[in-house]
Amino acid sequence: LKDAASASIYGAKAAFGVILITSKKGSKEAEKVNVTYSGNVSIQTLAKDYQMAGLSGITYSLAAATVSAKTTGAVGAFWYVNNVSYPAVVEFQNKYADLPYDSPLTYGRDWYMDENGRKMGVRLYDPYDYMVKDASFSQNHALSVAGSKGNTNFNISLGYLDQDGVLKPAKHDDYRRWNANIRVNTKVNDFLAVRAGLMYSKSDRRYPLTSFSNLNAWQYVYRWGPNFPIVAYDEFGQGTRSTTYEVQEAGTASMGTNYTSANVGTTITPVENWDINFDYTFAETTSTHFKPGTHYVGADVWYGTGDYYVDGVLQYAQNEWNAYNGLGATIPMQKFASSKWTTVGGLTDQIYQSTSIANRHTYNATTTYDWDINDKNNVRFMLGMNAVAYESRGHTSKRTILSDPNNPQFSLATGTQTVSGSHSWNSQAGFFGRINYNYDEKYLLEANIRYDGSSKFPAALKWRWFPSFSAGWRVSEEDWFEDAKDVVSSLKVRASWGSIGDQSVSNSLYIPTMSQSGASWVRAGALDNYYATPAAVASDITWQDIETIDFGVDFSLFNSVNVTFDWYKRNTNNMIVPGPGLGYNFGTSAPSGNYGSLSTNGWELMVNYGHMFDNGLSLNLTATLADAVTTITEYGTSTSVGGWYNGKTYGEIWGYRFDRLLTDEDFVWTTDAEGNKIHVVTSDSKNRQINKMAEGIATQGELRSGTQRSGWLPGDPLFKDIWGKDGTPDGEITAGTGTVNFKPIYDAEGNVVDYDYSVIEGYDVGDREVIGNSTPRYEYSFRVDADWKGFDLSIFFQGIGKRDMVGNAFLTVPGYNSSDGSMPETFAANSWYEIYDAAGKQVVASNYDAKYPRARNWGGGPSTYWTNNDHMLLDMSYLRLKNLTFGYTLPKKLTQKAQIEKLRLYLSCENLLTFDNLDGLPIDPEVYSDAYTYGNDSFNSSRQGVEAPAFRSTSFGVQLTF
């Protein structure tokens, strides 16, 4: 239920629509019991070919480190490469192409120490070989018993899910869920019916705990370069300080959830057409999260090594790369010291447990009366109320310094113990009424009124009225339409308007609360506590109002093609946002209040075709398409294009228009005393030193920081010059002030006294434009369902037509942090680069015909040369085959002999095919950010794609009914 009128009786929880789910009930066939079993076994594999850079990544990092000097001492994080070792890396890939991925780390073959004591990695490692299983398995079973006896029907169902995770080295990486449900309905007599239900669900998630922070193993899989060893053991049998070994040795964390729901209800029918319903539901959720720490002991490959002696005799290893490093045919054997790299009391030297319990009481009461005035006039009256009370309590405990990491217990830890707790509650209540009028099945009218209250607002502002109305006209039921029914089988037009209250905000926005903290000074032998000054609050916070107007049409052609179309406009008024107009001298953050508003315009289309052919083939086709655009209509006095200014399109992305990559011909050159070609340096309009550009090429010095802005080189991006002070290109790429120019308001003397923040007269953004939008646009799907002589086929596609994303991670930005080394293959293989020989004289590898700019190291984020531009935007549009199911139901004449009512076998595939425009990046187009993973925006530093890869699954199942 999407429009405000139809969703209104559900109150505040329906602010963004309602999905109605009807629980299974017992069979309506008298004195009959059906037993149904459904089970499947599933295999999960990678959803697409994930490729991280190997040799091409080494090439990129080296090229990025030698942009200016042409050679480098070394580049990398803990494990290095330079112009000397690079040829050895290249040769290794051919010489040891068949080396098993788990071959131990071997000195002289996989790495060597150079004359400066740096670990030069020659062997390359594919993280997916070490971290991801070739396949994981799951099983799902469901059993239900449904039946009836007399006026009573019942349904009992049981379910079990067992799903393995994807981490190859983990001791335990899995998820299990058990659930049970029972529902009973009985009609006592014509006056009274009663019902009851009980639901229970238990789930357990186990995973390797590699860190107590918001980072997990994938953060380091997608961080270090391909020559950083992630093989689990070295040649001496020591575990290595690698992601693989840490996951293997990590303690097993567990997350458990128990959900119980019990409901009872009754329906009283005093007279015909009058029903009175009472329902009560109690739901309780308990959760536990246990994190046992561990101590990591093994070869610390991050840091230095020592010479290896046996009985006092120095051992030597064969140096397979002497032709390149010149260190000799044999070199002193190196061995990493076996050490504990877990910091005492650090991230994994602790034990943690949290528990929470949440209760929800839901009360519903409605009465409905149907009044048939005559054959053409029908009226339905409904009155009702609903109330919800919610309360939750939580507790966490943590203690550091484990005495025995193999037996993590609070009583066996000796460090600091920390405890904390939480308690929250809220409640809502509402009263509503609805009147439906139906004239001759042609004209339909509905009116609703709600009176809602919420504990989240001050006493005087808790309660609000919310009305809604709708009307429909079944045009096809008019007498004059009869002749058209051969073509237009049915036609209905409708409209609705309504207002629903939204209270999806925190519980204490209007209450000034003081936070307690521990002081750092000691008094009377103990640390003092102190309370901070409360934040400023607005005492008049109340409901956010969501008003929706909807116009729709439903029609059917030839009794087989059904079309539904809706256009809607949804306005969120009194939106709770920070207060406007407070100066810096206010002293604290502006309090939030009902100061904002936004507006969404959208439409939805669904087309369905269904037909039964003479040969018994049943075919059903369904396609959907929807789009919506949201605009900020009121948000204080912000004038920054990066902020929430009035008139901003939600999700808009500002940046430059990419023209092409710079070439030698775009610069003015000269030669130095030795005859080497060098740039001519000049000054721009603001007296900044820049490399002189050829005639007609815009300068881009303003995009770099500092006074020396001459760093633009061949292979760097050239942006389009689209703006100047007179409105025409001016030969310089500039950023402007980044502000919105609102219409000024003048006094009688012509002085600006204020601004009209509803009228935008322009933008001071230099050569930037809106280059994309992060909001999903043109969401679509289509489904094919077919059935023929026991065979059934279901195909479901889903996609997004347009969506953009700005990259902010190793996997989404070329050169994000190339000194660490990790990057996707597509970035490394398709970037502009030059690699010189050890002397820095001759180019030994290059890629001038590239898609991405010159290899550079951004040091952890895009900036300067690779600022926001339309060439770097990720195209997140996609088409995915979400499900393909093929089944066969055996003929009853065969199964009934075994007392089987129905036997169906099927094959089902999820995420079987994905078509996207991500150029081979190892991220999933449906995962826009990683905030969802643990409900925390800082998970893995909010880096896109830094998590377990997406999988496809293939399942084989059976459905049995006795």
Label the predicted regions.
Residues 36-117, 612-770, 814-815, 825, ...:
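Conserved small-residue
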